[in-house]
Amino acid sequence: MTSLRTRMRMVERLRDKGIVDETVLAAMAAVPRHIFVEEAMAHRAYEDTALPLGHSQTISQPYIVARMIELLRAGREQSLPGGLGKTLEIGAGCGYQAAVLAQLAPDVYAVERIEPLIERAKQNLRQMQQFNVRLKYADGQLGLPEAAPYHTIIVAAAANRVPPALLQQLAVGGRMVLPVGAGEQALHLIERTPQGFLETKLDAVRFVPLLSGVE
């Protein structure tokens, strides 16, 4: 169940669901999702579903990972390395989405507020020999100002409102995608222009909440 063939079947399902960016699909195919899930869940690693990680967190559904990255890359493939440039991820979890991003972006900064998860992420990324990801144990709502600004910000937990710190850390010309909402949630795409921010509400989604502090 962990073979490349199984992984490619997952990619075909993503294509069937509407993911058209072949570069994103190739990145999804390159990352062995089974090493990022609990051993007891390894047989379900390539299902298109979120899976529990412990600590009330989940590893995101593959379709949502691909969809968010596709939104961030659209129209920027020629202007930025990997269509993403320098990327900030909020909610690194076990490191799966960071590993996918790292197939495309030259530099990925990933923040996680739960210490046991970030230790697992470090181990998983080391196993993959993925050395262009910098992991930080910190409050994701505050972003990572020391490496700002970012061309791309991706958030893997739902905020009641867009965190101001993340807006400040987005470069002019940059894009951010994140789920917004307490009850009903939707993906929001935010683009920073010289004049300000453009915000577009997109797909209905369900994510764990974006919490403050660390644990």
PLM regions with names:
Residues 1-88, 100, 104, 117-131, ...:
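Class I SAM-dependent transferase core
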Residues 72-198:
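Conserved nucleotide-cofactor-binding alpha/beta core module
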